């Protein structure tokens, strides 16, 4: 089942923080799994992460040349959470005229994060529905 998460840029650490979105979204982030849990080592946090785990990583497929897994990143406008758009399709429409998909990573790192810092980011990028991706996570920048 997919989880609805809210994204925030932590400019001090240059990472995206993915927090639960819902009636109590101001509560703590995802708790760390217990030491004896059956979770795979690829999905469990490193010991250096705090107990209030900010999921400051995105799946490695997010910055791949072919784009993220289609079922992983879904954008939704905060005002109309019922109508979601596929992030890959949304991004493809935004990058029309770009010469190649090799610009995917520079676009995310330069354009998207700059807009985020300036506060002029499209509200559809504020919420992602994540689920089903088994790629390892990476740290942006």
Curated annotation (Swiss-Prot):
The UniProt keyword set, sorted, is:
Activation of host NF-kappa-B by virus, Activator, Apoptosis, Host cytoplasm, Host G2/M cell cycle arrest by virus, Host mitochondrion, Host nucleus, Host-virus interaction, Modulation of host cell cycle by virus, Transcription, Transcription regulation
Q: What does this protein do?
A: Multifunctional protein that plays a role in silencing host antiviral defenses and promoting viral transcription. Does not seem to be essential for HBV infection. May be directly involved in development of cirrhosis and liver cancer (hepatocellular carcinoma). Most of cytosolic activities involve modulation of cytosolic calcium. The effect on apoptosis is controversial depending on the cell types in which the studies have been conducted. May induce apoptosis by localizing in mitochondria and causing loss of mitochondrial membrane potential.
Listed GO cellular component terms? host cell mitochondrion; host cell nucleus
Task: Report the source organism.
Answer: Woodchuck hepatitis B virus (isolate 8) (WHV)
Q: Which domain of life is it from?
A: Viruses
Signal peptide from the UniProt entry: none
Family stated for the protein in its record: Belongs to the orthohepadnavirus protein X family.
Q: What is this protein called?
A: Protein X
* Residue ranges of the region described as Mitochondrial targeting sequence: 68-113
Q: How does it assemble?
A: May form homodimer. May interact with host CEBPA, CFLAR, CREB1, DDB1, E4F1, HBXIP, HSPD1/HSP60, NFKBIA, POLR2E and SMAD4. Interacts with host SMC5-SMC6 complex and induces its degradation. Interacts with host TRPC4AP; leading to prevent ubiquitination of TRPC4AP. Interacts with host PLSCR1; this interaction promotes ubiquitination and degradation of HBx and impairs HBx-mediated cell proliferation.
Q: Does the keyword Transcription regulation apply?
A: yes
Compositional bias per record (Low complexity), positions renumbered to this chain: 25-48
- Indicate the principal place this protein occupies in or around the cell: host cell
Q: What HAMAP family does the record tag this protein with?
A: HBV_X
> Residue ranges of region Disordered?
25-52
In its record, the post-translational modification comment is:
A fraction may be phosphorylated in insect cells and HepG2 cells, a human hepatoblastoma cell line. Phosphorylated in vitro by host protein kinase C or mitogen-activated protein kinase. N-acetylated in insect cells.
Q: Which InterPro entries match?
A: Transactivation_prot_X
Q: Where in the cell is it found?
A: Host cytoplasm; Host nucleus; Host mitochondrion
Q: Does the keyword Transcription apply?
A: yes
